[in-house]
């Protein structure tokens, strides 16, 4: 169900990646495909394009579809932007749609200091995805390397894809 599984028959586990969302013609199609793979606990990455205008609304649509099929567990993950602010807005949107039990996960180079700051700001978060800073102290910096999908092949043509964060949209 993941890209590596589909392309190379290598089973993979983990969270939804921005490259997964970019692989599909639209965010909603990516979310639906992911929900088919992981209907029991579907956690959707909502910040590839725009958290509040498309990510969360599309996640809610997919959760409604899953709910009708008897799957009631899920959540969203926010990986960029003002996570405290976005989590509060997203929580309100999920609650208003009836998904009060769906979780909100924060990630993005988190450490104990950033997590504390998020909590002090009243972020509406249920869990934290801690990656490279889990095993490397801030005093001993880490080289943060991430995979970014730049293009996909569709009908024999290369089609560009881009991931934008909330902060990068300010500068465009």
Regions found by a protein language model. Give the residues of each.
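Conserved small/polar residues in nucleotide/adenosyl-binding loops
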Residues: 170-172
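Anaerobic metallocofactor- and corrinoid-dependent redox/one-carbon enzyme cores
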Residues: 157-166
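Buried, small/hydrophobic-residue-enriched core segments of structured protein domains
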Residues: 1-100, 112-114, 120, 134, ...
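Glycine-rich phosphate-binding active-site loops on the catalytic face of alpha/beta enzymes
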Residues: 124-142
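Structured core elements
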Residues: 43-45, 75-77, 103-106, 124-129, ...
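C-terminal helical cap(s) of enzyme catalytic domains, especially alpha/beta-barrels
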Residues: 119, 136-157
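Generic detector of intrinsically disordered, low-complexity, polar/charged segments
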Residues: 11, 126-128, 153
């Amino acid at each position: 169900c993941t890209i590596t599984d589909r392309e190379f028959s290598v089973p993979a586990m983990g969270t939804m990646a921005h490259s997964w969302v970019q692989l599909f013609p639209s965010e909603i199609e990516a979310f639906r495909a992911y929900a088919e793979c992981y209907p029991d606990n579907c956690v959707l990455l909502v910040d590839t394009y725009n958290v509040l205008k498309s990510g969360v609304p599309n996640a809610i649509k997919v959760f409604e579809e899953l709910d009708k099929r008897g799957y009631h567990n899920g959540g969203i993950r926010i990986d960029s932007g003002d996570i405290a602010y976005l989590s509060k807005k997203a929580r309100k949107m999920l609650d208003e749609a009836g998904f009060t039990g769906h979780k909100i996960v924060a990630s993005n180079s988190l450490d104990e200091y950033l997590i504390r700051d998020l909590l002090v700001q009243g972020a509406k978060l249920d869990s934290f995805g801690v990656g490279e800073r889990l095993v490397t102290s801030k005093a001993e910096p880490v080289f943060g390397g991430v995979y970014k999908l730049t293009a996909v092949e569709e009908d024999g043509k290369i089609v560009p894809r881009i991931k934008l964060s909330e902060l990068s949209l300010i500068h465009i």
